[in-house]
């Protein structure tokens, strides 16, 4: 959790094992001894994050024989719980920019593909429904990751999120804009 938080807020390049150790309440030596390297720790944090996303979608309560609409609503509720943890949102977004990295690129591709497989094959969304669900999620992640509401962008952030989230938009925006602890 500590590594996801620090990597999410600062990215791979900006995060340090010292900051992660402070966040976890352990020594930097312990972090290095446990994980070996920052790259290994980032890989573990990536796996943890993708596991959390997959598990959230797998465990979304969907009644037997549910319609596509009911499935999408349950998955949407699970997604809203995920974005409440800004660290996981930012961690996945940073991973999606690292496609060319020799270690993190394959992790990001497999993570994204595994989420798609959960939506399609385990939760039963049609290909177009899964693609639209992911596209909407990526746009929401982008608005939140950019902190679009800061400065002159608040109206645009509110408009975009209202379109994407309906009645949950202001709640998500308020939670995302809440002050974060300094790392």
How does the language model describe each region?
Residues 101-114, 119-183:
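Hydrophobic/aromatic-rich alpha-helical bundle segments in the mid-to-C-terminal region
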Residues 69-93, 98-106:
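Helical hydrophobic small-molecule/effector-binding pocket
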Residues 2-5, 9, 23, 33, ...:
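Alpha-helical structural segments
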Residues 12-22:
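Ser/Thr-centered, proline-biased regulatory motifs
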Residues 36-40, 62, 66, 83-87, ...:
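Residues in soluble alpha-helical coiled-coils and helical-bundle/repeat scaffolds
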Residues 60, 64, 96-99:
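Secondary-structure edge/capping motif, primarily at the C-terminal ends of alpha-helices
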């Amino acid at each position: 959790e500590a590594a996801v938080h620090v990597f999410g807020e600062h990215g791979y390049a900006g995060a340090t094992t010292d900051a992660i150790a402070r966040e976890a309440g352990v020594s930097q030596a312990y972090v290095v001894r446990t994980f070996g390297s920052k790259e290994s720790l980032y890989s573990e944090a990536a796996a943890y994050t993708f596991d959390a996303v997959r598990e959230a979608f797998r465990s979304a309560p969907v009644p037997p024989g549910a319609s596509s609409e009911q499935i999408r609503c349950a998955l949407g509720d699970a997604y809203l719980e995920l974005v409440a943890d800004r660290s996981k949102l930012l961690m996945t977004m940073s991973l999606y920019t690292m496609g060319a990295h020799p270690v993190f690129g394959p992790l990001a591709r497999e993570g994204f593909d595994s989420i798609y497989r959960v939506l399609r094959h385990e939760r039963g969304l049609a290909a177009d429904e899964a693609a639209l669900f992911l596209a909407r999620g990526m746009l929401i992640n982008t608005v939140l990751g950019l902190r679009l509401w800061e400065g002159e962008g608040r109206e645009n952030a509110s408009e975009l999120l209202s379109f994407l989230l309906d009645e949950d938009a202001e709640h998500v925006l308020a939670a995302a804009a809440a002050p974060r602890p300094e790392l």
